[in-house]
């Protein structure tokens, strides 16, 4: 994302044979500042990924105990491990989308066809969607912690982060 912006601005100035204007430099400085916020959020989510996934799964299974009961979709260690793995993969691709500022990597490499795969396997997409929403709550709480991150208003970024989780939940529901 940032690299493309820098390349575009420099190429435009170069094609006109001009130095970068103060406005262009300010805009690029803002891109860096916003990029630092993205890095902070991704770093926090990544550093806490295991906890986010585990706690989301635990909360999901408390709400929907039939999933881990005999005959449930997460019953047996193998199925439980597959559930946790899938939640972790979805979270990982959400962090890629946050970093890029673009949902296409999430859609193209993770979500496209996921609902159909779950349907074919008999996995309840609505339960996966609940798990994703629980990961969203945890990730946003972690991302909103003001300690040790780039200062500034992050409300737009947090809304964007929430939208990636919502997109993932809608894709599997």
UniProtKB/Swiss-Prot annotation:
Q: Does the keyword Cell division apply?
A: no
What are the binding positions for (2R,3E)-phycocyanobilin 1 in this chain? 83
Q: Which UniProt keywords apply?
A: Antenna complex, Bile pigment, Chromophore, Electron transport, Membrane, Methylation, Photosynthesis, Phycobilisome, Thylakoid, Transport
Q: How is it modified after translation?
A: Contains two covalently linked bilin chromophores.
SUPFAM superfamilies per record: Globin-like
Q: Which NCBIfam families match?
A: phycocy_beta
Could you tell me what this protein does?
Answer: Light-harvesting photosynthetic bile pigment-protein from the phycobiliprotein complex (phycobilisome, PBS). Phycocyanin is the major phycobiliprotein in the PBS rod.
What protein is this chain from? C-phycocyanin beta subunit
Q: Which gene underlies this protein?
A: cpcB
